[in-house]
A protein has these predicted regions:
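C-terminal segments of enzyme domains that contribute to small-molecule binding surfaces
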Residues: 2-12, 72-78, 82-83, 100, ...
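Active-site cofactor/substrate anionic-group-binding motifs, chiefly glycine-
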Residues: 50
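Left-handed beta-helix
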Residues: 15, 20-21, 26-27, 32-33, ...
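Solvent-exposed, flexible loop/coil residues
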Residues: 7-10, 17, 47, 68, ...
Length: 170
């Protein structure tokens, strides 16, 4: 797993976290317990810190850039090829495949940003809502069953990543 120091700051990855061997993590990054960073993902904290909580999955080919302090909470799923740029993502949120979340945006707890949605700079997404479109707009509230699926998904990624670790695929 390529971890690179930048300006004297080296990434800190919890020993139970999984980082794919071709993911790149640069600078002032912290990755929490049982989280996973999948193939082709780049996490770059060369301007501001990036903090990723526990049981969070950053799926394949994502870009996370700390243009401002970037905080991704616990039990978050960042979908394939999503871009997360200088923002805050609350616990249990989902950022859909190829979605973009711009600088200063705040995604509430258990909110879902739909696939391909674009959350504009400084936008605030309420907790337990689903947003979609370009620009992203609220389309509905999150159901209790959907909230449970998010928790199940985060747990499933944590379990899968441990299988990768057991097979020395990091």
């Amino acid at each position: 797993m390529p971890l690179a120091e930048f300006n004297g700051k080296r990434p800190k990855v919890h020993p139970t976290a999984f980082v794919a061997p071709n993911a790149t993590i640069i600078g002032d990054v912290e990755i929490g317990e049982r989280s996973s960073v999948w193939y082709g993902t780049v996490i770059r904290a060369d301007i501001a810190p990036v903090r990723i909580g526990r049981l969070t999955a950053v799926e394949d080919n994502c870009v996370v850039h700390g243009s401002r302090e970037t905080i991704i909470g616990d039990e978050v799923i960042v979908g394939h090829a999503a871009v997360v740029h200088g923002c805050r993502i609350g616990n249990g949120a989902v950022i859909g495949t190829k979605a973009v979340v711009f600088s200063g945006a705040e995604i509430g707890e258990r909110a879902i940003v739909a696939m391909g949605a674009v959350v504009l700079q400084d936008t605030k997404v309420e907790a337990r809502t689903v947003v979609a479109g370009i620009p992203a707009k609220k389309i509905r509230e999150l159901s209790d069953s959907e909230a449970k699926i998010i928790t199940w998904g985060a747990q499933s990624y944590a379990e899968l990543s441990q299988k990768y670790k057991e097979q020395n695929l990091e």
